């Protein structure tokens, strides 16, 4: 496989590597993928990277790394699909919040060799027990009291006993939150731009330990002040 990726002059052939990446992803998942960018091989690395998305899920762009020798691909597609399901569950858990919210979830150490995008949270954690999740919640605060919010936010990780990580809380206008949504849903990862966009919206970060959010009304009040 590797030899075919080098042209007659001994140079790496980007076009062939893009095709190899697309084929590797399709064989791994049984889905069709589009490669949007070839990033090449960084100095000293034994793999190259591409930007890609599944045709069935263009809203989930990701970065895939393909081993130069074996052609094996490692990527966060399974993790990102799982994060989407976690976000949906969180929205249901805190549905009693009266204000409009936006939730998205990201994972640390998200790139895997796992092949089932529909894997359950429990099975995922058996395979990737060190994974920690960041659940970002943006609130367009209008009517909810701090007590109501604190009570509901305690339910964020209900149903995810082994979930560890953090709840990151923000508040903003509808326009600000929509801007964040567009950014989060169009980038492989959160970069410096995300920090800049959310600096003025950020309220605080609260630990999640084995599915329990460590948050009190007092802590929420102290961090949020009069912004909630």
Spans of features found by a protein language model:
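Short, non-transmembrane alpha-helical segments in secretory-pathway proteins
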Residues: 10-37, 86-98
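Exposed beta-strand-loop-beta-strand "reactive/processing" segments of non-cytosolic proteins
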Residues: 32-66
